[in-house]
Structure formats: C-alpha cells, structure tokens
Design a protein with these regions (language model features):
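Cys-dependent protein tyrosine phosphatase-like superfamily
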Residues: 1-93, 105-117
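Short, well-ordered coil/turn residues at beta-beta hairpins
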Residues: 36-37, 207, 220-221, 373-374, ...
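Beta1-alpha1 glycine-rich phosphate/pyrophosphate-binding loop at the start
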Residues: 118-188, 272-316
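A Rossmann-like FAD-binding core segment of flavoenzymes
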Residues: 144, 187-196, 201-204, 212, ...
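FAD-binding core/adjacent interface of flavoenzyme oxidoreductases
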Residues: 190-296, 357-360, 371
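FAD-site-proximal beta/loop scaffold in flavoenzymes
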Residues: 235-262, 366-429
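A conserved FAD-binding loop/helix module that cradles the flavin
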Residues: 412-461
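C-terminal auxiliary extensions adjacent to catalytic cores
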Residues: 468-521
Length: 521
C-alpha cells in the first residue's frame, strides 16, 4: 500500500511516518529526496531509525536528510536549516514526521516571505453546498466584501437527488451544473486545492504553491468518502452488481440493477457514523423494495440491511414507522455488521459482526446486488491540521460555529465536528448563522446567532411517499410544518422530489434565506 501523501506544492509534499517498504513507492512516484522530521525513538521500537531509512533510500537513488523537530514545534534555526536543505536537495521532496503536521509547519515557516500573499476579506474553503451558499449570503449582506472561494472541481452536484435517481424518479443530468454557473457574482473562484492552514499568519496555502491571506476564514470542504477502507470495493464498484448512491456516476447503475433483479440476494450496508445523510442507506433499500414489490418479484428476493451500529435510525421517534416498512418489505436487519471486504467477480462480501459479548466474527455473505455506503471522514487536510478536534473533524462551537481558538475562523457543512445530521438542510440554517456572526465579528459586535443542530432527512419509504424527519441537537424534533412528522405523506415526496431541488438551485445558492430561523434552547 502506498503512503498517504499530502502535496504542499509542486516541489514539496509531506506524509505521516514512513516504513522502510514505503521508500520504493516514493521512488516510483518520482520523488528524489526524503527528509525525516521525526526524532529517532519517538514512536518506540516500531519506528524505523533514520539511519536505516537513509541506507534504504540511498540504495534506491533517493537523497536523504535528517532534520528532527520536537512536538513542541520548529525553531527558527530549523527553518533556516530546511531552507538550506531545499537549496541542495533534488526535487520533488517528501518530508515526514508522525502525522505530517510538523513537516508542513516547518516548510510553511521556512518559506514564509518567499511567496506573495494575495489578501482577501474572507476566504471560503470549498465550493459545495455550504461554500457557495455562505458566500452568496455574505455578499447579500455586504457586496463590497472581497471573497475568494477555493474549489478545484469544475462541476457542482445536488447530491440529495441521487437517491431519487437510483429509484428511477429523477434524471441524473439534472443533479449537476458547472461550478462557474453557481459561483456567486462578486466572489473570486480559486481553482485549486487547499494544502495547509497557517492560522497564526491568517493564511492558507494552496496546491499550486500560492498563498491567500484573510481577515476571516470559512471552512466548508465537506467530507471524504473512504472507499479504500473496504478491501476490494474500489475495483468492484460499477460492475458485478456492486453499486453506491454516494457517487454521481453510480446512482444510475443502482437503478439498472434494481430494474434487472428478479430474484436472489440484495445486500444494503451502512457504515459507522457520522456519514452524510444518515438516512440515505435505508432510502436505497426502501425504494428498491418498493419497485420489486410493484413488479411482483419481492418475494423472490432476499433483502438484508447490514448496519455497523445498533439502531435503525438515530432519532427513536422515527424507528416505529420505519420498522413498519422494513417488515412490509420483509427485509432482514443485521445490526453491528460492518462491511470490510468485497469480491466483485465472485459476488461475495465479508462483514465484521460484533456479538453481545463484544467478540468480532468475520461473516461471509453472497449477493446478487450489493449497495454500499462507504466509511466517511473529514478531508485529510483537515484531519492533519491543528484546527481539527480529537476525532479529526473541524473544531467549532456547536452554537456559533466559530473555532474555539481562532475566533476569525468559522465552519459550516459536513466538515463540522458537531453532532447534527450532515445534510443539505443543516447547511441551509448553518450558513445564516455563520454569515450573521461573521459580519457581526467584522463590526466588533456580539455574535447574534446560535445554531440549534437542525437537520432534515426526507426518508423515501416508497416511491411517492416520504417521512419527513426534522430534528436538532439531542434528537429534539424540529418540524417545519404543523403535522405529525412520523406519517408518510405524498406532500413530503413533492417537497423532496420537486420543491427542494428547485429551491437549492434558485434559493440557497443565490443567498435566499427561506425557513432558516433556529430555535436554540
């Protein structure tokens, strides 16, 4: 397995602790020099000593340098030493320490002043739902703001509709638009990736080696789908009956599989939380089963839902009405059953099942159709940053969405280390909290808004009916409409399939703030 590498710029990348066996992969990737920033013996006997690493590197034709940095941080002398090394070592260079953080910080300090910093009032990291929406909301409040939006992708997706695509109820082409069309007028689109934060200097470093300065920073890059954590999955996706509604190009394949399956075994999976739209894994099951029932083939299909957790849904109020559909579709629930391996050609999946005694057993299951929801985590650049919490998500106050140590930094969307559901509905309310609080901060005023943890999950229990689950922190019900939220309704389907997509493109992304009031306790 190749080491996980974070590219800082064209000539310099960083990595967590390397093994001796990683050096051959680095040479194959084109690196010409390796710098070790981790002191010998810091990680105990399992950490390769720099002498052994140097010998192995030189045998592969790689230059090697040892510049140990303590966990307390780099000194000015060490920054000067790195500058000297960089003038001598052939590039590109790969530096490593325990996590990569010290190597990133040392490089940032060593190259400080050598690059021009472009100044902005506000820098927004990410051009997804949260990034575009909060930028539009800020410009509505103050059109004079100089805002940069960092987003490498040229396409912008409306992801909540992919479930409908997989159920034959939506055109996949209607879920994507060019990023240039949704970028708010007045904002500058920076087509690059974020490489590192330098919060002490109020600067972010980009993949092209440039730097952007900010007075305020909003971090909303979304989350990262960790397909690689399930052995064999990446090679199997899109063929052999293996699919996922978490990818734009695979949602149509799900519908193809559903239409063609007339009998056999259909497995649906849900990884450990948190994930984006926690109801999406079971939505795939419900819409598939509804189609099979209407086609008269459900009795010939064995349906099983494998959940890594111990509950069907995180808010207990909605479990009874959902269980009625599980029973009606004759789906079997397998709790504490986590997908760990897939063999597509042989249509076999393996699950780690945790028993009541805590013992884990590896269970093999055959399938004709396998719908996979991948494990999910914060992006690498967040997890390796000092701005992350202990779980790797972006650290914010759950009410103000402000970073606890850097008050000029806010966050919104899936990247936040908050306990709310990671949904577009949550973003709709978060961006107003962030926009109002950021503007107040710029004026030296008290932050006026508090986020209540609102999130919404329109559970598509059958084609044409939805249970509209709306809730906040602690599972508190926060219904928008004065109706029993546990009842499946046609009106909620119309909201999900017609009104919300229209509002997303014409409302949220344009700074129109409808139904955004929060009700914190």
């Amino acid at each position: 397995m190749e080491p996980t590498i974070k590219r800082i710029d064209d000539s310099y990348s960083v990595s967590a602790q390397l093994a001796l066996s990683d050096l051959q992969a680095l040479a194959a990737l084109g690196f010409r020099s390796v710098v070790c920033n981790r002191p010998d013996h810091e990680g105990g006997p399992e950490q390769p000593e720099q002498g052994a690493m140097q010998q192995a590197a030189q045998a592969l034709g790689l230059k090697f340098a040892y510049l140990p940095v303590q966990t307390t941080g780099a000194t000015p002398e060490q920054a000067q030493q790195l500058r000297a090394l960089l003038s001598e070592l052939p590039r590109p260079v790969l530096a490593y320490c325990r996590t990569g953080n010290r190597s990133s910080t040392l490089y940032e300090v060593a190259t400080q002043g050598t690059r021009t910093v472009r100044p902005f009032d506000v820098v927004v990291v990410g051009g997804g739902s949260a990034g575009i929406s909060v930028t539009a909301s800020l410009l509505k409040r103050d059109p004079s703001l100089r805002i940069a939006v960092i987003e490498p992708s040229t396409e912008h997706y409306y992801q909540p509709a992919w479930t409908l695509v997989a159920g034959g109820a939506y055109d996949v082409n209607d879920t994507v638009r060019p990023t240039r069309e949704v970028m708010p007028k007045g904002a500058e689109w920076i087509k690059a990736s974020l490489s590192a934060f330098a919060p002490q200097r109020k600067v972010v470093l980009l993949s092209d080696g440039s730097e952007l300065g900010y007075q305020q920073l909003i971090v909303c890059p979304g989350l990262q789908l960790a397909w690689e954590k399930i052995e064999g999955l990446e090679d199997a996706l899109g063929k052999h009956g293996v699919t996922s509604n978490y990818r734009h190009d695979l949602a149509p394949y799900t519908w193809e599989l559903v239409r063609s399956l007339r009998g056999g075994k259909a497995l649906f999976t849900q990884p450990g939380m948190p994930i984006k739209c926690a109801g999406a894994p079971q939505k795939a099951l419900y819409l598939s089963c509804d189609h099979w029932r209407k086609q008269g083939v459900l009795e010939a299909i064995s349906v099983e839902f494998n959940l890594a957790g111990a509950a069907l849904f995180g808010v207990p109020t909605f479990v009874p009405p959902l269980m009625k559909y599980v029973e009606a579709y004759k789906a079997q629930l397998a709790f504490q059953s986590n997908l760990v391996k897939v063999d597509g050609p042989n249509k076999t999946a393996w699950f780690d099942v945790t028993g009541a005694d805590g013992q884990v057993t590896r269970v093999e299951k055959r399938f004709d159709m396998l719908h996979v929801v991948p494990p999910q985590q914060a992006p690498d650049v967040i997890r390796r940053s000092e701005l992350a919490d202990s779980a790797g998500w972006f650290e914010v106050d759950p009410a103000t969405l402000q970073h606890p140590r850097y008050p000029e930094i806010f966050a919104a969307g899936d990247v936040c280390g908050t306990s709310n559901a990671k949904t577009a509905a949550a973003v709709r309310k978060q961006v107003v909290v962030v926009a109002d609080n950021l503007v107040a901060l710029r004026k030296g005023a008290v932050l006026p808004k508090r986020y209540d943890g609102y999130g919404s999950c329109p559970l598509t229990v059958e084609k044409g009916k939805v249970i509209l689950a709306e809730f906040g922190y602690g599972g508190k019900l926060l219904p928008t409409f004065p109706m029993n939220p546990t009842v499946p309704r046609k009106s909620a389907w119309f909201l999900k399939a017609t009104l919300l997509p229209w509002f997303y493109w014409q409302g949220m992304l344009k700074g129109r703030e409808w139904l955004t009031d929060c009700k914190p306790d």
